[in-house]
Every structure is written in structure tokens, then in C-alpha cells.
Amino acid sequence: MDDSALPSNTSNGINGRTAHRRSSSGGDPFQHPDIYYGNPESVERIKNRRRAFSSSLKSFNRQDFHEMLGDRNTRRGSMDPTSGNPRKFLIDVDATLHSLLEREDSDRNMQITIEDVGPKVFSLGTAASHGYNRFDVRGTYMLSNLLQELTIAKDYGRKQIVLDEERLSENPVSRLSRLIKNSFWNSLTRRIDGRNIEVAGRDPKDWTDDPRPRIYVPPGAPEQLEYYRRIAEEKPELRLDVQELAAEITPEYVRDLNEKPGLLALAMEEKYDEKTGKTDFAGVPFVVPGGRFNELYGWDSYMESLGLLASNRVDLAKAMVINFCFCIKHYGKILNANRSYYLTRSQPPFLTDMALRVYDRIQNEPGAMDFLRHAILAAIKEYYSVWMAEPRLDPVSGLSRYRSPGIGVPPETEASHFLHLLTPYAEKHGMEFKEFVQAYNYGKVKEPELDEYFMHDRAVRESGHDTSYRLERVCGNLATVDLNSLLYKYEVDIARVIRVYFKDKLEIPVEFRTPATKDIQSESSSVWDRRARRRKMRMDTYLWDEEKGMYFDYDTVKQERTNYESATTLWAMWAGLVTPRQASAMITKALPRFEEFGGIVSGTEESRGAVGLNRPTRQWDYPYGWAPQQMLAWTGFARYGYQEEAERLAYKWLYMITKAFVDFNGVVVEKYDVTRPIDPHRVDAEYGNQGVDFKGAPREGFGWVNASYVYGLEMLNAHQRRALGAVTPWETYSKAVSAQGSDTVLENRSE
């Protein structure tokens, strides 16, 4: 970060300010853009005030100022003198935006970053002088904030604005937190109903000849089927294709649906429409990850819920639990995402913890107990029908695997993605590439090696860790640390809920039973307690390595433990399944293997192995770090009393995000290279990085990174948050605290 990137007042207070200051126009300088840029009255007030000046004063227009001041870089001494009062700038949006980009955006990417070689100083006219007096805005951070504010003002159609200097010099921790809470969550929120089905129903991964909005409605929701058919009739221009799903979902059926891929319906609620005066259906909202991920995703939603709760958006977190329960009830599982080609594929299960966290915030509201009951019943059904059933359950070890059933090439990727893999098989059968893919998908040619490959490929995608050398070509055989830690948490949570909230007996309605549990009319806590104890015993037997102080995945086919060191070993601490002795071993032996400059890395460099042209980097391997690994680790460390470790690692992760945010025009991305101090958002592995490619201003960040930021701030004390606001590296902060502590000890001794 360049020396002038941050203004001198950014570290003032925990949030950069002790309270929101009222601007001279009577408004909060940190208002939401809907309010701040939604009303042009502030500019009119400035103009009216000027008209009230003595008529003996010479009248100046904007061209006069340009002729007087020109475009020269004026000395700081010739600018508006420093004032104790917050400045406001009177700005012509289009002209200023054009001039700013011409001067400062040297690489012409519509962003102002530390890599641009402009003068890093830009003069603005003050509102108090009607633009006559000028003031320099200096440094990458303030200039990029100016670009962002002008871009947003232009989005709102504003030609002129009065802009608070405080909005440019705002403490970066406060600014990013505010953007996440007030803007990013809203930008990432979706509903599926007639008002937006045209956009939501379209799929960029629809490779068919006739891509069109299409929605599949489960047979158990006839009211939705009627609703969407009505929408299709009322709006024929949408070309909306409404289909009812079959009652039985098989791999063959899902394969056939790939010819007509579509959106899967989610939960709806009845709402009164003030415009029509009638009650109609509205989609229950959900938060999407961002970028090209525009559906309800499985474990992304849990991670996002942690941030939503930290942002006091309990309504959205609750709504996503409701959507998950709908998915389990009608589709049999929490889906990878709500698209037809994901019908046989799930994702890491977090429903019980998610529901309990939401319940803790709504427990005094009407219907809270019904909400908890419904969520736990759904989790029990998912546990039995998905994770404790074939093909995911390994009957020998008693542990579970990611092993999604399916047929053929995964349709969400273009077939050309597997060109290198499939071409030799096509040549073997004397077929063109597309012809072979079609023949293979429909069983006209048999290739057991490909069957094995795609079984593991689907498993990797179900694990959420796509892709990693830890899982490649073997995932479907692995009883992984992460999945079995999550299922242990399910077992413990379900036992506690039944015991504490339902008097140790939870009645199971017929719709929440599975073929294997059709005769189980109620559940008791003791059964689930025993399951948790058995799972821990099996994990300690098959997965725990005493010498290395960590858990490893277990290959159920080879019947041996793997040796890939993965940060998922720390999920066991999050789940609470380790003993205090094991926790101590993980902190002293395992954690140092994963701790890097920017937090926890997905896996060790040694485990990943050499990479190069013929063995490219995978995004879930070293040197990349992901928000889920960080949040679960912090929570696990704090759970076992390792608060210092939790704070240190949270600080490192948040510092890395903050520094990229300050230096690179407000960027917030899907994943980071936790070994790169300068530009950690630069990730070239596989699919690139979501959240990088924006023009002028970031609109949404990325779901689980947004969550990790506001959730992580809750881990830090006030002193750490102030240091973070000054973009202080952990090492500098730690040394300062240690030195301060040493001085205090010496002072006490001298007394």
C-alpha cells in the first residue's frame, strides 16, 4: 500500500467514528445510497444559498473556475485551509468522473489501485464556496472511494451531487462493514416468483439449442404449479416453460432433464399486493454467493447466514432455513444449488447449526418453536435419506462419504471442459467428440474407467471443494474429516434439541420419514447421543493420527488413511468432537502447518506437491485460503478456549481482505492467496476469481467473504479493530502490544 493511500483520520475509533455526524444538510454522511443519492435537494439548497449572497459579488460559473484554476496540480497551500468542520464537495458527476479516470486510471480498467501510476491527487471544489475554493483529495484509498461514489451516483441518475469528505476518508473497516450490511447483502438477495422469473429462470450454463426460462415444480406443491402456469399465460413474451417434476428422482431421470435444464422451485409465501389489492404468492428470499453463482447454494448459504446474523439480518438467515426445509421435503436433500442438474447432488450439511443460531435470535417471537421443530425434522430426514444411506454410507467403517449418484458428463460444465479427457475415448470408438459424449451419457458405449472418473468428479463437486488434489479421482471413496465432523455435529445438535426443547420425545410426521425409517414414529435424545459417540470412536480409529496431531481422510476402498494435510482437520474442533488433549495437539502440531500470512491455507504445500504445465494449480489447494475454513477454525478455537489463536487468525484474514479493499478499489473476492502480502485477490487457478471484474464500484462483494468479515470482527477486541482500521499488519500490531506489555511490567516493578 502506498504511503498516502489512507487519510490520517481513518483509525479514529473502533468504527472510524464514535457516532454518525449530521451533515450541514441535516443528513447522515454515511446514509444508504438510496437516501444519499436518491434526492437531489442538497444541490438545490447549495444553489439557493448562493442566490442569497450579496448581489455585489461577481457571479462565477463552472467555466470561470476552469479558466482560473486550469488542470494544474496546485500546491496544498493554495487549497482550502484545513478545517475542523467536515468538508462537502459540489461535484458535476459526469465531468468529474471522466477527468478522474483520465488522470488516475492509467491501466484503463475502470478502477483506481496502487498499480495505477497517476499523480494520486485530485482537486475538488467545496460546496461551501460553490466550487470556488478547491481541496486536494490524495492517495489511492480516497481517490478510489471517490470513483466508487461517483459511479454509484451515476447509477442513480445524478448529474450533480454534494459529497461529504467523510465518505471518502471513512475508516476502511467501517466502510467495508457498512457496504456489506447496507448494500452487498441487498445486492445478493434473490426471490423466485413471477416478478423476476424471466431473469432467475435463465441459465448461463444452459448449452441447449433453445435456452429459455424454465422452472420445475415438485408434485407436492400444486399451488406453485398453478401459480407459475398462470404467470406463463399472463406473460407469453417470457416463453416461460413450467414443468412438474416426477415423484421419483433417479439418475436416469435427471440425465434426461439435462435436455431441458431449469430452475427448481423454492419456498413461497402469501403476500398482499397493494397495487392489485389481492393476495398472491411471493418467493421466500435467499442470498446467492455472487458472480456467476446466482442460485441458492448449499454450504454457501450457511456461511452467509453467519454474516447475516452478525449484520442483524435475521430475516434473511431464517428465510434460507425455510428454503432448505422446502428442498429436503420436496427434493430429498439440501441441493448443491436449485437447478435441475443438481437434483442428485447435495453439499456439506450445516442445517442444524444454522437453525439453532437463527432460533437463538427469534426464540421469543411467535412461531419460533414451530420453526425449530420443522428444521430439526428436515435435518433428521436428510441425515437418514442422504448421508446414512447408500451410496454415501460405507457399511464397513460406518462413516459417510461424498458420493453423489449420477450418469454421464456433469452438464453444468461445457463438454469441452473435459475435451482432454474424453478425446482419446472418442477416437477409440471412431466418433466425433459431441457424438461420443451423447453416446456415453446414454449408455450406448460403455467405459468403466470414465464411470469411475465421473463418480469421483461428482463427489468432489458435492464436497464443495472443487477442485483439489486431495480429492481428485478418489473423493467418492473417502470418509472425509469434514463430512463426518458435520454429521457428528448433526447428531449432537439433534440430541440436544430433542432433550431440551421437546421433553426427550420428538414426534416424526409421515412426510418426514424415509423408506428406511417409515416405522419410526418418534425420536429420543439417547439414540442420537449413542450415534455421536460411535462416530467419534470410528473417526478416532480410522482418521486420527496421534503423531501428527490431526485427522486425515480415510480411503474406504483401500482401507487406509490418506496423508494429505487439509485444513478440514480443524472442522473437528468446530464440531466439538475432539478431547481437550486432541485439541491441544491440533493447536501445537497441526495449526502451524496451515497458518500463513493471510490466515489458514486450504492444505500444505508439501501435500499438494509440485505444480506446473502438466499439473496445474487447484483452487482448493495451497496457496489459497477460503472463508469457510477461516470461520470454522475461529469458532472451533474459541470453543476450546484458544481465544488468542482465534483472534490472531481472524485478524490476519481480515487484514488481508482490508488491505486488498484499500489498495484495489474496494475489491472483495471469492478466495485469496494467503501467501501474497501485496495482491492476495489475484488467483489464477482454474476458474479465476469471482468479484474481481467490476467497473467503478463493487456492488456485491462475495457472499461468504462478506460474512467472514463481519463475523470475524466480532472475534476481535476494540484495540484490534482500531489497528485493523489503520491497516496494520499482524506482526506490527503484535510487536506493539508486546512492547506495551513489557513497559507496563517494568513500570510495575519500579513501583
From Swiss-Prot:
Regulation: Activated by calcium.
Stored InterPro entries: 6-hairpin_glycosidase_sf (IPR008928), 6hp_glycosidase-like_sf (IPR012341), Glyco_hydro_37 (IPR001661), Glyco_hydro_37_CS (IPR018232), Trehalase_Ca-bd (IPR011120)
Lineage, top ranks: Eukaryota, Fungi, Dikarya, Ascomycota, Pezizomycotina
Signal peptide extent: none
Gene ablation phenotype (knockout): Abolishes trehalose degradation during conidial germination and delays germ tube formation. Resistance to thermal stress.
Enzyme's top EC category: hydrolase
GO MF term list: alpha,alpha-trehalase activity; calcium ion binding; trehalase activity
Role of this protein: Hydrolyzes intracellular trehalose to glucose. The disaccharide trehalose serves as a storage carbohydrate that is mobilized during conidial germination. Regulates the level of trehalose as a protectant for cell integrity during heat stress.
Binding site for substrate: R292, W299, D300, N336, R345, S346, Q347, E412, R461, G464
GO CC entries: alpha,alpha-trehalose-phosphate synthase complex (UDP-forming)
Binding site for Ca(2+): D105, D107, N109, Q111, D116
Pfam families linked: Trehalase, Trehalase_Ca-bi
Reactions performed catalytically: alpha,alpha-trehalose + H2O = alpha-D-glucose + beta-D-glucose
Residue spans of biased composition, Polar residues class: 1-15
Active-site residues from the entry: D466 (proton donor/acceptor), E670 (proton donor/acceptor)
Pathway listed: Carbohydrate degradation
Protein's name according to its UniProt entry: Cytosolic neutral trehalase
Keywords: Calcium, Cytoplasm, Glycosidase, Hydrolase, Metal-binding
Comp. bias (Basic and acidic residues): 64-78
GO biological process: ascospore formation; cellular response to heat; cellular response to starvation; trehalose catabolic process
Induction comment: Induced during recovery from thermal stress.
Chief location category: cytoplasm
Family indicated by similarity: Belongs to the glycosyl hydrolase 37 family.
E.C. no: 3.2.1.28
